[in-house]
Amino acid sequence: MLSRHNIRAPLSTTGSALDKATPNQWIDWTSNASELSMRGGTLETMMGEYTRKWLESEGLIPENYQPEEGKVRFYANAKQRTIATAQFFSSGMLPVANIDIETHADYDKMDPVFTPATTFVSDAYVEAALKQIGAMGGATGMTDVCAGLAESYALIEDVVDYTESEGFKSGELKKLDTTDTQVTIEQDKEPAVSGSLKTACQLADALVLQYYEAPNAVDAAFGHDLTMEQWKLISESKDFYVDLLYTAPLVAANVAHPLLQEIGNEMDADGRVFSFLCGHDSNVGSVLAALEAEDYELPAAVESKTPIGCKLVFERWANANGEQFGRVRLLYQSVDELREGTMLPGTVSPESVEMSFKGLQKNADGLYKYDDLRARIADAAAEYDRIVEKDGQEELAQAA
């Protein structure tokens, strides 16, 4: 299970660009900037409880499971929001097991496994990767890559009263412009974006999180009574930011490489019953892109691809003849579940969407041959080495 952390406070602190972009007052959070909120912890415990009930109902674990050493693994990026997410989930899933959360970096530092950084970079690679990113804008490339966000930008500006903000009036912030986006790719750094998309993403992120956290939806939108479709429109800027930076084939194969290796190792680990890896939306998005996931839609979600607290679940099943099959699902809580904090009864599932992958065939039960699924993960991890080998060659742009 590859998880995105649950609800957190916005990444920016008081006095930041986020504050300067609106004359309105953001809500008071129950946690410090970037940290898991109390609501996020409660929701994550519920996700753990659902997982426990589901596994028990399938006969995969006994009630009040206390796993022997090596049977389960909880590994999180060393940020507060990811460690806390893993801790709350483990409390819900294994309430009497007192699970330790494994980290491999100093506290509050990014673990290389969960850091979506380009660890191989060359002039030829950057040129090819930027060409793929620009292709998201169609024939005109990077100039129009954000053209589809015009309505999202306009709604964000209206909701936060952007032109009445301190930053806009002082000239520090400019009107959101869909044509000023620039992407940079550097060695051992995360892909970065400059221009209006960065500002729009920060505002969309804070607004959507505030919508999840605040009791009153109108207050969350600074007095605007927004429809579900309008909240989705706001989220488009944030969602596209993740797509733009992390899901182009050459970029996904690069930034997801260490996590794909980790997932493969967990699936091969002898005796492992359950693994929980906790990271970020960029991790889930880049892994799905590297695995060549087909397009999908998420019912009852504001965020279109990797909603808060979502889990990418890799499952292995066997029939009476010992044949093994695989299934991959994206598990997430609906907007109502996030906002209301409601626990679903019994083994009723949160929202669940089955993933499909290009070039792989499902059987009549909607399952893949396990060997085919495992081979796809191995092939996606190996794509990194192929990119390195093809560096400088004409076919680099087709390597991924």
Task: Enumerate the language-model features and the residues they cover.
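Signature for phosphate-centric chemistry
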Residues: 1-71, 77-275, 279-400
